[in-house]
A protein has these predicted regions:
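An N-terminal, well-structured beta->alpha segment
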Residues: 22-88, 109, 156-182
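Gly/Ser/Thr-enriched, mixed-charge loops and adjacent short helices
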Residues: 123-233
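N-terminal small/polar loop signature for handling phosphorylated ligands or for N-terminal nucleophile
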Residues: 63-124, 197-251
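Short beta-strand-to-turn element immediately C-terminal to the catalytic PLP-Schiff-base lysine
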Residues: 129-132, 249-253
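Proline/glycine-rich low-complexity loops and linkers
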Residues: 85, 142-167, 252-276
Length: 276
């Protein structure tokens, strides 16, 4: 599909009028990811184009792929995998998994793609690109956007991959001296595959709420919700995640803590553990 940079001034004006008239939403393209309403302003051809462009950045010939729990995730995942395989990239399929798990795997094998629109509304979806365990730069984004004129490659292979995230995290965190009663608001997202088991492994007594997206009592973004159910059920500690589990809100002492406090606590703990 055409992007505004490729249009004349008159054509861009007509496009703005069309969007205003028909409430057309434009796909968001940034180093944080490609995001849009799948099937309305974000299409299969976009997925193929951006993944083709991203393949130019992959030097190891390997790419981890994970996704959150959105309804369109599996459809996009198959398209992403097929595109990578066609480009000669070996695909490590992590299935439904938190974004940090994909980042860690990408650091190990060289690249990763997360199919997510993070905390955006459920009808949205998108692609987050990772190189060597980090997000892409502005220069790399320009390469991702130019998914044309690619040489033919041998077909890559697909590997259903497990993650050592939980076992490695337990080694870093260690076991708790005193068991904690923890309530986790999954938010219907990917946290369900990691958070409960990890907390149990370090010695917590865990209760979960909103395990599935269907019937979830709140929206995708825990920072914009009062988290009333979580607050009422939390005894020692509570955690609320967004759909791809790269946002977390802490509940303690009968109330929801701000995201700034949550981040600060995480940074302090990381420094104490010597994590960089």
């Amino acid at each position: 599909m055409l992007y505004q940079a490729e249009l004349s001034r008159h054509e861009r004006f007509l496009l703005r009028v069309y969007k205003k008239r028909f409430w057309f939403k434009e796909v968001k393209i940034s180093i944080s990811g490609i995001r849009g309403v799948y099937g309305k302003d974000f299409f299969p051809e976009d997925v193929i184009k951006f993944c083709n462009g991203f393949s130019k950045l992959i030097k190891t010939g390997k790419c981890a792929i994970g996704m959150d729990t959105r309804e369109t995730g599996e459809m996009i995942q198959k398209l992403v995998s097929a595109t990578m395989l066609e480009r000669g990239i070996d695909v490590y399929n992590l299935g439904i998994t938190p974004t940090p798990v994909v980042f860690r795997k990408a650091r190990e094998i060289g690249a990763g793609i997360v199919i997510t629109s993070s905390h955006n509304p459920l009808e949205w979806n998108g692609l987050k690109f990772i190189i060597d365990g980090r997000g892409i730069t502005l220069d790399e984004l320009e390469i991702v956007k130019n998914g044309k004129n690619l040489d033919k490659k041998d077909i890559g292979k697909e590997i259903i991959s497990d993650s050592n995230y939980i076992s490695d995290a337990v080694k870093i965190i260690g076991k708790l001296n005193k068991p904690q009663q923890v309530t986790i608001d999954i938010g219907g997202g990917a946290a369900k595959t990691i958070a409960p088991k990890l907390l149990q492994e370090i010695g917590c007594q865990v209760e979960t709420i909103n395990d599935e997206l269907d019937g979830c009592s709140r929206g995708p973004d825990p920072t914009s919700n009062e988290l009333t159910e979580l607050v009422s059920k939390t005894k020692d500690l509570g955690f609320a995640f967004d759909l791809d589990s790269d946002r977390v809100i802490l509940v303690m002492n009968g109330g929801k803590k701000s995201s700034d406090i949550t981040l600060g606590l995480g940074v302090v703990k990381a420094i104490k553990l010597g994590i960089k």
